[in-house]
């Protein structure tokens, strides 16, 4: 079993994700191996809120080049978490 803090890596703060907070949706960067039920349990455990829905997006790593050497940035996974009306996550409030 994975720990909740291993599944949720960090909150995603962007213009689009901040506009989603008005609709009670919060965006996180999560472990690429985590599934929706693990993400739901982790958010409920850490922030003490009720999650209604979890949508996930897999972001492919971009190709990077340093002189003649080609490489790739790692793939990431985003999760958009919809909360019950009335619930809030405080880390998104002051931004």
Curated annotation (Swiss-Prot):
Family according to the record: Belongs to the universal ribosomal protein uL23 family.
GO CC annotations on file: ribonucleoprotein complex; ribosome
GO BP annotation list: translation
Protein name (record): Large ribosomal subunit protein uL23
SUPFAM superfamilies the UniProt entry points to: Ribosomal proteins S24e, L23 and L15e
Species this chain originates from: Desulforudis audaxviator (strain MP104C)
Pfam families: Ribosomal_L23
This protein's UniProt keywords: Ribonucleoprotein, Ribosomal protein, RNA-binding, rRNA-binding
Gene Ontology MF, one: structural constituent of ribosome
Lineage: Bacteria, Bacillati, Bacillota, Clostridia, Thermoanaerobacterales
Xref: NCBIfam families: PRK05738.1-3 (NF004359), PRK05738.2-4 (NF004363), PRK05738.2-5 (NF004364)
Function per UniProt: One of the early assembly proteins it binds 23S rRNA. One of the proteins that surrounds the polypeptide exit tunnel on the outside of the ribosome. Forms the main docking site for trigger factor binding to the ribosome.
Domain of life: Bacteria
Keyword Magnesium annotated: no
Assembly behavior: Part of the 50S ribosomal subunit. Contacts protein L29, and trigger factor when it is bound to the ribosome.
């Amino acid at each position: 079993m994975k720990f909740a803090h291993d599944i949720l890596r960090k909150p995603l703060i962007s213009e689009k994700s901040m506009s989603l907070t008005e609709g009670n949706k919060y965006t996180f960067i999560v472990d690429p191996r985590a599934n929706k039920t693990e993400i739901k349990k982790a958010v409920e455990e850490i922030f003490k809120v009720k999650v209604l829905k979890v949508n996930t997006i897999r972001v492919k790593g971009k190709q990077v080049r340093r002189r003649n050497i080609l490489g790739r940035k790692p793939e990431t996974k985003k999760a958009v978490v919809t909360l019950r009306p009335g619930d809030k996550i405080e880390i998104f409030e002051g931004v």
